[in-house]
């Protein structure tokens, strides 16, 4: 797709990144860290578009917006995740881009805030008739189980992906529940969400476009079992290579019954629109032994690394340059460019 004309001569695309992902150069530019997701996306963009400039997001904001107006990009490819390390403020960046009239990739502030609040997101999905784990919320100091059977899965009500998710998130008794709640409170992670634990297969489904194509579900595989083997996707499992090697963690295309695959293909676009997602996203599910599908959470800003799900398997399971091209196209088409 050809990039649209812009009223101000400038670059084709600005790659907007967190300032911590690179360093300033002597000539006033910005160099992203070699091998980073930002570097991978930048390389893919430059293979297709003639002028792509990385710009760091400065917490003071004015410097960043001045750079964007000076460059006059036809599209901002938004890879930012936080302001001053605070992920809960990512929606402020998209609001700023909208206020200044820039077309950008990815979900708007409305969708970012909705998916971050796991209670509201689950309520929106449950309203579609899609199964979600039962839950209760805990704000106080004492663990009061609202009659859900153990084990329970306890995580912050608000947060990203595997943030604060460790083996301790799975609790089997009241005393373990109390320790988990105390730990979350000590780290100031806000109210806790206590869910019934759904035993089953972890499925990850990528969606591309705004009439979203539902791509082949991927499945988490833990090749080595035994005491201490991971039962769900923790932060350690996702980001620690030694841990992944120890437990032979990998991902594969999920071999699913036709009926389950049909359920996924029907449910995912509904969830995508209900949660105000845009351009691309990832939805996480659990599938029980009797093939009951449960929605777990949505990731409005999934990792776009080339190897997110293993060697040469990006989050969508498609060829990497094609993934980046389709995200650009989706954003431009959505914005009427």
Identify what each model region corresponds to.
Residues 93, 124-126, 255-337:
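ATP-dependent carboxylate activation and anion-phosphoryl transfer catalytic cores
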Residues 2, 6-17, 68-70, 112-201, ...:
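Active-site nucleotide/adenylate-binding loops and adjacent lid/helix of ATP-dependent enzymes
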Residues 1-103, 110, 140-144, 334-336:
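ATP-binding N-terminal substructure of ATP-dependent carboxylate-amine bond-forming enzymes
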Residues 174-266, 289-294:
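Phosphate-binding site of ATP-dependent enzymes
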């Amino acid at each position: 797709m050809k990039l649209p004309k812009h009223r101000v001569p400038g670059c084709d695309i600005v790659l907007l990144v967190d300032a911590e992902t690179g360093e300033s150069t002597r000539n006033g530019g910005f160099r992203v860290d070699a091998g980073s997701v930002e570097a991978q996306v930048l390389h893919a963009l430059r293979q297709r578009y003639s002028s792509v400039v990385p710009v760091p997001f400065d917490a003071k904001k004015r410097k960043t917006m001045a750079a964007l107006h000076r460059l006059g990009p036809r599209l901002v490819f938004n890879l930012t995740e936080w302001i001053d390390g605070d992920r809960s403020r990512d929606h402020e960046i998209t609001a700023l881009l909208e206020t200044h009239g820039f077309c950008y990739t990815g979900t708007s502030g409305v969708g970012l805030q909705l998916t971050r609040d796991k209670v509201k997101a689950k309520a929106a999905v449950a309203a579609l008739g899609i199964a979600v784990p039962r839950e209760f919320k805990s704000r106080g100091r004492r663990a009061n189980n609202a009659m859900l059977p153990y084990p329970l899965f306890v995580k912050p009500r608000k947060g990203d992906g595997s943030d604060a998710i460790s083996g301790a998130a799975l609790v089997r008794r009241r005393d373990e529940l109390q320790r988990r709640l105390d730990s979350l409170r000590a780290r100031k992670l806000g109210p806790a969400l206590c869910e019934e634990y759904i035993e089953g297969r972890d499925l990850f489904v990528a969606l591309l476009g705004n009439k979203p194509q539902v791509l082949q579900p991927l499945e988490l595989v833990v090749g080595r079992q035994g005491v201490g083997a991971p039962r769900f996707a923790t932060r350690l499992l996702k980001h620690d290579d030694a841990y992944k090697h120890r437990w032979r963690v990998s991902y594969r295309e999920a071999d699913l019954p036709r009926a389950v695959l049909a359920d996924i293909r029907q449910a995912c676009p509904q969830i995508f629109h209900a949660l105000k997602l845009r351009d691309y996203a990832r939805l996480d599910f659990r599938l029980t032994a009797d093939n009951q599908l449960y929605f777990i959470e949505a990731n409005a800003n999934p990792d776009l690394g080339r190897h997110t799900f293993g060697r040469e398997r990006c989050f969508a399971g498609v060829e990497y340059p094609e993934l980046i091209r389709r995200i650009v196209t989706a954003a431009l088409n959505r914005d009427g460019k």
